[in-house]
Amino acid sequence: MSSGKSARYNRFSGGPSNLPTPDVTTGTRMETTFGPAFSAVTTITKADGTSTYKQHCRTPSSSSTLAYSPRDEEDSMPPISTPRRSDSAISVRSLHSESSMSLRSTFSLPEEEEEPEPLVFAEQPSVKLCCQLCCSVFKDPVITTCGHTFCRRCALKSEKCPVDNVKLTVVVNNIAVAEQIGELFIHCRHGCRVAGSGKPPIFEVDPRGCPFTIKLSARKDHEGSCDYRPVRCPNNPSCPPLLRMNLEAHLKECEHIKCPHSKYGCTFIGNQDTYETHLETCRFEGLKEFLQQTDDRFHEMHVALAQKDQEIAFLRSMLGKLSEKIDQLEKSLELKFDVLDENQSKLSEDLMEFRRDASMLNDELSHINARLNMGILGSYDPQQIFKCKGTFVGHQGPVWCLCVYSMGDLLFSGSSDKTIKVWDTCTTYKCQKTLEGHDGIVLALCIQGCKLYSGSADCTIIVWDIQNLQKVNTIRAHDNPVCTLVSSHNVLFSGSLKAIKVWDIVGTELKLKKELTGLNHWVRALVAAQSYLYSGSYQTIKIWDIRTLDCIHVLQTSGGSVYSIAVTNHHIVCGTYENLIHVWDIESKEQVRTLTGHVGTVYALAVISTPDQTKVFSASYDRSLRVWSMDNMICTQTLLRHQGSVTALAVSRGRLFSGAVDSTVKVWTC
């Protein structure tokens, strides 16, 4: 082995030489000056002028044992063994040939496991450049809301500042501190080694490694071209790891150099000397121009084939999009045909309904004319026109229920604001008191004797003493909101989801007597008349015997769910979700008429009866009230004064009270 090669390899065997011998023939110029703290600074300038490195060479006075091991840096390289002659497959000549790689193209050792990047400072950094959370030099310093600077990772992991105990929130990068840290001098990673077996590992200066110190900000530039960087032989993976500066010497002695025509079938493997001899006799060497032309043609064919594949893929994608668009057009066309058929069917149904309505109107006109000719209707009485006489204002939400205490001329109103207001309807016409106690919307009110019962969305019934307007009892009545209440024969009935509960009234207590079942929806309407209870649930009205609590009859509706019920001396009336009012004969239970006119759900019904006539009042989602004469089943008046849906009705002494979503209660009289 030559003396030059021995000098190169002495560093592995513990020889005296620690620095690489500069090659004068390359034209490299070296200058040494003194940097900070009298550290020697060596500037190496290559002759071609392509790159210049300013590096601080380690001196005993500038070496430091301070080590910083970030946990998220690149992997460190394994220790380098002594290079030796080994199997290789590339020669120095092939490095300079067109078919091989350049000497500058090297392969780094594979990263087997993640380890912290070695960081050993040439001089002790100032404590002002250390994070108070991790006690190490700042890495990616940021300013937080408290004004202090920490590593970004530390600031994100810690909840509070260790100085003033303020919650940490990153505000902005601390560029000034980052630049100061970038000016610190460190030892090249290839000049450091692990000291001890702790975790995270601590690094120290390796006297056999790279002797240069560099600025932290220029670390990657230096380490990417460091002569002490471990590499592998590019020809054979079985060759041991080498230093970059020893790669060229290794390639001259490699025993695994392959023929440049190995891809065509040549099986030669040898060293540099046999490689040159083989080229003179290789059968592929004389055909290299033809082989190269063939390779070029194959390459052109591959490129053309790839272009054709791309064109085919593009055409397929366009075909797929075109098919999708055709499918969409077909679906759209089918949908339009369906809509057209549906509209045509609806128009036909509407036309038939209009014809039925016209026929019904003709029948009613004929009936009215006949009654006029017989003198039954009598003369028109302007005093029967209902007018709005006043408005009670005070609730902070929609009014859902009304109830009148005729003994004291008091009106009770329940609202979404969870309160019940007591109104004087005789003298002051003002709110006497606001009753509070429910935790939900007040949905139902009922009076029995001198007690007021209120049902709410909070599933409870509260008993109030009307004399002093105080709460006297609270009963957990249902598992769902209490929708409606009615009393009769000292018994209270409460309606909820699929259930009606029967309560015996004992003073201020309610004793559960029975639960009426067989209901399939919300019980939104309850009316007690004479000895019968009428309940509305979904599209049925059930009639119960109050004494036996048995269901004795069921009426079926066809206009949506039942929302309201009223009973007169001769008729049973119900309002439905589908804007209709159905009328049955109370004796025969036969439906006699369906009243139309509303354009919204009929929420409430009320009855005013006199010896001469009976009037039914209906309240609807369409913000209107309608007055119906039960003598001829026609609407005699429409009342429009509310600004929202009318939800509740109550009557007393010929007066009508209406509550609405506009949070008001209006008073109507003739």
Curated annotation (Swiss-Prot):
Protein name: E3 ubiquitin-protein ligase TRAF7
GO MF annotation: an example: ubiquitin protein ligase activity
SMART domains from the UniProt entry: RING, WD40
Keyword Transcription regulation: yes
PROSITE patterns found in the cross-reference section: WD_REPEATS_1, WD_REPEATS_2, WD_REPEATS_REGION, ZF_RING_1, ZF_RING_2, ZF_TRAF
Catalysed reaction equations from the record: S-ubiquitinyl-[E2 ubiquitin-conjugating enzyme]-L-cysteine + [acceptor protein]-L-lysine = [E2 ubiquitin-conjugating enzyme]-L-cysteine + N(6)-ubiquitinyl-[acceptor protein]-L-lysine
Keyword vocabulary terms for this entry: Apoptosis, Cytoplasm, Cytoplasmic vesicle, Disease variant, Metal-binding, Nucleus, Phosphoprotein, Repeat, Transcription, Transcription regulation, Transferase, Ubl conjugation, Ubl conjugation pathway, WD repeat, Zinc, Zinc-finger
Biased composition (Polar residues): 15-31, 49-67
UniProt record similarity statement: Belongs to the WD repeat TRAF7 family.
Biological process according to GO: apoptotic process; positive regulation of apoptotic signaling pathway; positive regulation of MAPK cascade; positive regulation of neuron apoptotic process; positive regulation of ubiquitin-dependent protein catabolic process; protein K29-linked ubiquitination; protein ubiquitination; regulation of ERK1 and ERK2 cascade
Cellular localization per UniProt: Cytoplasmic vesicle; Cytoplasm; Nucleus
One GO CC term, this protein: intracellular membrane-bounded organelle
UniProt PTM comment: Phosphorylated by MAP3K3.
RING-type zinc finger span: 131-165
Described purpose of this protein according to its UniProt entry: E3 ubiquitin and SUMO-protein ligase that plays a role in different biological processes such as innate immunity, inflammation or apoptosis. Potentiates MAP3K3-mediated activation of JUN/AP1 and DDIT3 transcriptional regulators. Negatively regulates MYB transcriptional activity by sequestering it to the cytosol via SUMOylation. Plays a role in the phosphorylation of MAPK1 and/or MAPK3, probably via its interaction with MAP3K3.
Pathway: Protein modification; protein ubiquitination
SUPFAM superfamilies linked: RING/U-box, TRAF domain-like, WD40 repeat-like
Tissue expression as described in the entry: Ubiquitously expressed with high levels in skeletal muscle, heart, colon, spleen, kidney, liver and placenta.
Main location: cytoplasm
